Swiss-Prot record:
Residues 61-97, 117-192 are annotated as: Disordered. Its main location: cytoplasm. GO terms for cellular component: cell cortex; centrosome; cytosol; nucleus; spindle microtubule; spindle pole. This is Protein FAM110A. The gene is Fam110a. It comes from Mus musculus (Mouse). Pfam families: FAM110_C (PF14160), FAM110_N (PF14161). May interact with CSPP1.
Length: 296
């Protein structure tokens, strides 16, 4: 039977059902052998029938382009670590097929070294080196101080703050305080020195305000100036010294805190009283400066 008279037969693979045909991608479906026309898609069919449901002529003449996904632009420089770029001069040469053969003498010496106990002289040798290089002594490094001395130096450089030791008072200078004296009447030396320094600062400030020369003030006498200006600084508070009599101490010890606060003199001087004291003080300075004239 001649070959030309043979007609093309049916495809070898049976036709797929509709259920499987919708799930299988189009490029896997069998194509017709005769190269028939492709079935138009729904978009193409709507585009062909646009004149039926579109009233505007301008819209009917336009063609809708298929929607394409946006292109994701990759950054020029990725934030992650990049491998080193090899220039033509730095390209890695392909390694040769032969690998360097291991020296049997070195291997045997290493095995013997592991089996035998290590001596101090052999411990200084570096494994993997020939015997000639083992005799080289490394340069001596300066000895480092032990960690204990370093810790001691650190303690010496930054000592902990220690409270100052108070000197013990001698038995001859100790004074017996009365047991009935309240703690409010005891004044420390620092409090008294602070009061004296404050009074001296106020006195110097008053001299500068009045325009008095400090040398002239020293020439007039410190005792006279201090006595004349004692009324300007402030009113004297309750006495900080020891009690004059035992009766006064007992009266103070029996008083309460409220009574002591009422007995205190209020701090502050009126403007009129202050001006009067200034005039009195300036008059005293004038009398001290001008010698008394004798009438004769």
């Amino acid at each position: 039977m001649p070959v030309d008279t043979l007609s093309p037969g049916a495809p070898a693979t049976p036709a797929l059902p509709f259920r499987l045909r919708t799930k299988v991608p189009g490029y896997l479906l069998p194509r017709p052998a005769d190269g028939g026309a492709r079935k138009p898609s729904a978009v193409e069919r709507l585009e062909a029938d646009k004149a039926k449901y579109v009233k505007s002529l301008r819209v009917a003449n336009t063609r809708q382009e298929p929607v394409q996904p946006p292109l994701v632009r990759q950054p020029l420089f990725s934030p992650g670590p990049r491998g080193p770029v090899l220039t033509p001069s730095r390209r890695v040469l392909p390694c040769s097929g032969r690998r360097p053969q291991l020296d049997l003498d070195i291997l045997s010496s290493l095995i013997n070294l592991c089996d035998s106990p290590v001596s101090p002289s052999e411990a200084s040798r570096t494994p993997g080196r020939p015997e000639g290089s083992a005799h080289k002594v490394p340069p001596a490094t300066p000895p480092r101080p032990p960690p204990s001395t370093v810790a001691v130096r650190r303690v010496d450089v930054r000592p902990l703050p220690a409270s100052p030791a108070r000197p013990y008072p001698s038995p001859g200078t100790t004074t017996t305080s009365s047991p009935g004296r309240p703690p409010g009447l005891q004044r420390s030396k620092s409090d008294l020195s602070e009061r004296f320094s404050r009074a001296a600062a106020d006195l110097e400030r008053f001299f500068n305000f009045c325009g008095l020369d400090p040398e002239e003030a020293r020439g007039l006498g410190v005792a006279h100036l201090a006595r004349a200006s004692s009324d300007i600084v402030s009113l004297a508070g309750p006495s900080a010294g020891p009690c004059s009599s035992e009766g006064g101490c007992s009266r103070r010890s029996s008083a309460t805190v409220e009574e002591r606060s009422l007995d205190r003199v209020p701090y502050g001087v009126s403007v009129i009283e202050r001006n009067a004291r200034v005039i009195k003080w300036l008059y005293g300075l004038r009398q001290a400066r001008d010698p008394p004239t004798t009438e004769g």
